[in-house]
């Protein structure tokens, strides 16, 4: 038989005077005490004393130098704070101003006028050939497919170019730059316009000479 059931340190038969001593010791040598037996606690009265109320599991600190701590209040605090939060949320929703996602156009125009140039000021500023590649007064010369579109000239620009071509069919670089600045065109546009105009003039002169020759030949035939 194992020692778990019978303690080998004490004999089975003891004297009548030692039975009281046996009752104070545990019957198991494995180190586990009887769960039904109660021993006196080192602090305070034992649980065996008669009390009119149940003991609490909360113990104040033993070595507190600032006196005994006040008992904690475990009242229905969550319900109180929940009601308070709901009341605050309702009051905050009433005081919240309406939200405007899109600003007004007048405000945007005012901001542009204060912090930057407006569209009218940008168009009124002079643009020189070395500042911009294409013509700034006209629309973009490139179409949606990326190809260069046909350049259009105003009546004033065409009139001034025709006057210059009437006096000079070939322009110097200095004169070409002056005309480009005066007509708000690029130097390349002036150069291309004069090339096309010379080709047209040559074609017209050829047609005119051909018509003159044909007219002379008819006169000679009639004279014969």
Curated annotation (Swiss-Prot):
GO terms for biological process: anterior/posterior pattern specification; embryonic skeletal system morphogenesis; erythrocyte homeostasis; regulation of transcription by RNA polymerase II. It comes from the Eukaryota. A motif (Antp-type hexapeptide) lies at residues 127-132. Keywords: Developmental protein, DNA-binding, Homeobox, Nucleus, Phosphoprotein, Transcription, Transcription regulation. CDD domains: homeodomain. It is found in: Nucleus. GO terms for molecular function: DNA-binding transcription factor activity, RNA polymerase II-specific; RNA binding; RNA polymerase II cis-regulatory region sequence-specific DNA binding; sequence-specific double-stranded DNA binding. Pfam families: Homeodomain. The keyword Hydrolase does not apply. Gene3D superfamilies: Homeodomain-like. SMART domains: HOX. Residues 146-205 bind DNA. The modification Phosphoserine is found at residue 214. GO terms for cellular component: chromatin; nucleus. Sequence-specific transcription factor which is part of a developmental regulatory system that provides cells with specific positional identities on the anterior-posterior axis. Belongs to the Antp homeobox family. This is Homeobox protein Hox-B6.
């Amino acid at each position: 038989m194992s020692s778990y059931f019978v303690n080998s340190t004490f004999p089975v038969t003891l004297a009548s005077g030692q039975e009281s001593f046996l009752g104070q010791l545990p019957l198991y040598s494995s180190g586990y005490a009887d769960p039904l037996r109660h021993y006196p606690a080192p602090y305070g009265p034992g649980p065996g004393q008669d009390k009119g109320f149940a003991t609490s599991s909360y113990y104040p600190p033993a070595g507190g130098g600032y006196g005994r701590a006040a008992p904690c209040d475990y009242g229905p605090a969550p319900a109180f704070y929940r009601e308070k939060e709901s009341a605050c949320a309702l009051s905050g929703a009433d005081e919240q101003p309406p939200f405007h996602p899109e600003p007004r156009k007048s405000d945007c125009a005012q901001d542009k006028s204060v912090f930057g140039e407006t569209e009218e000021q940008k168009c009124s500023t002079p643009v020189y050939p070395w500042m911009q590649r294409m013509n700034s007064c006209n629309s973009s010369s490139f179409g949606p497919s990326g190809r260069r579109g046909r350049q259009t000239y105003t009546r004033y620009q065409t009139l001034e170019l025709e006057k210059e071509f009437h006096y000079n069919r070939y322009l110097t670089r200095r004169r070409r730059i002056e005309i480009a600045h005066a007509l708000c065109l690029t130097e390349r546009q002036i150069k291309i316009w004069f090339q096309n105009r010379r080709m047209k003039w040559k074609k017209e002169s050829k047609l005119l000479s051909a018509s003159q020759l044909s007219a002379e030949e008819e006169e000679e035939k009639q004279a014969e």
